[in-house]
Design a protein with these regions (language model features):
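Catalytic active-site module of serine/aspartate enzymes centered on a nucleophile-bearing elbow/loop
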Residues: 251-286
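Glycine-rich His-Gly loop
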Residues: 35-38, 106, 231
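Glycine-rich phosphate-binding loop signature in dinucleotide/nucleotide-binding domains
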Residues: 28, 95-98, 283
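Conserved HGGG/HGGXW glycine-rich cap/lid loop of the alpha/beta-hydrolase fold
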Residues: 13-77, 91
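Conserved hydrolase catalytic core segment
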Residues: 98-137
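Helix-rich cap/lid subdomain of alpha/beta-hydrolase
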Residues: 131, 135-190, 206-208
Length: 286
């Protein structure tokens, strides 16, 4: 493991896992808390959470393969949920922090669920905020709603991507995931730059990678304490995904964050952080 320079007081480290260098931030001491980011972002999206939770925990926040600003070793051929889940498990084991408390948001929440299914030794508890996976949704009416909502959510971004406007697609992904236009432009320059730095991943996220598949039986086998969390203002897709996953996991608690959208960790971090603190307090590890 080696270090590079980063914008935070925490060191930005490199860990060699599965043949690649994974960048991650590590800060604080105590029980390990691993933050898993979603699409078009990297470990910097968790800066607010890192500052708060590193007071009492060893906080680890990786940038998944192909995300962040590091040069790629290939053209993105291995971009897939399976790659990211396996990288995450390998990193947790290499750092010697298993089982860790896992916090995932959006695509990262889907990866966190898959991690608990495929690598249960790595997970001590799970806080999953609005996972983007819906393969466990079976009710025909809910499937219809999810399908229509997904098309509505990604349509503008796909149109911009097809014109080669990856930067424009980033803003569209952010706004439509939150169901409100203008939010991306209202972000601080620092926050907006994190997402724009990951514009090169837009073709990959809409590419031919095998989608993540988690079924109800998979979720039923998760035995660790879980909080499935969503915002009170979230889109139908994320509401249904969160609620159905909650109903499938035996040791799950549902947390609804008032007046929060999909990007609550960035837009309303105080509310998001309180929900996570409540989870950790219930585990007596806050």
């Amino acid at each position: 493991m080696s270090r590079t320079e980063g914008p935070m007081t925490a060191a930005v480290n490199l860990a060699h896992v599965n043949g690649v260098d994974i960048e991650y931030v590590e800060q604080g001491e105590g029980l390990p808390l691993v933050f898993v980011h979603g699409y078009i972002s990297d470990h910097r999206v968790w800066d607010d959470q890192i500052r708060l939770f590193s007071r009492h925990h060893k906080v680890i926040a990786p940038s998944q393969r192909y995300f962040g600003t590091r040069q790629w070793r290939d053209r993105g051929e291995r971009f897939s949920p399976s790659t990211h889940v396996d990288d995450l498990a390998a990193l947790i084991r290499k750092l010697g922090v298993a089982p860790a408390h896992i916090v995932g948001w959006s695509y990262g929440a889907a990866l966190a669920l898959a991690l608990a299914v495929r690598h249960p030794d790595c997970v001590g508890s799970l806080f999953a905020y609005e996972p983007g996976v819906t393969t466990f949704v079976e009710d025909p009416e809910e499937v219809r709603i999810v399908t229509e909502d997904r098309h509505d959510m990604v349509g503008a971004a796909l149109a911009l991507k097809s014109r080669g406007d990856s930067a424009g697609a980033v803003g569209a992904v952010f706004d439509h995931a939150n169901g409100s236009t203008g939010l991306f432009e209202a972000l601080s320059d620092t926050a907006r730059s994190i997402f724009l730095d990951n514009a090169r991943t837009v073709p990959l996220m809409f590419g031919a990678a095998e989608p993540l598949s988690i079924n109800r039986a998979d979720l039923a086998h998760i035995k660790v304490p879980v909080v499935m969390a969503r915002g009170g203002l979230t889109r139908p897709l994320y509401r249904i995904a969160t609620d159905v996953a909650h109903g499938c996991i035996p040791a799950s608690r549902l947390a609804v964050i008032p007046d929060a959208m999909h990007a609550s960790p960035v837009l309303t971090p105080t509310r998001f952080n309180q929900a996570l603190l409540d989870h950790l307090s219930a585990l007596a590890v806050a």
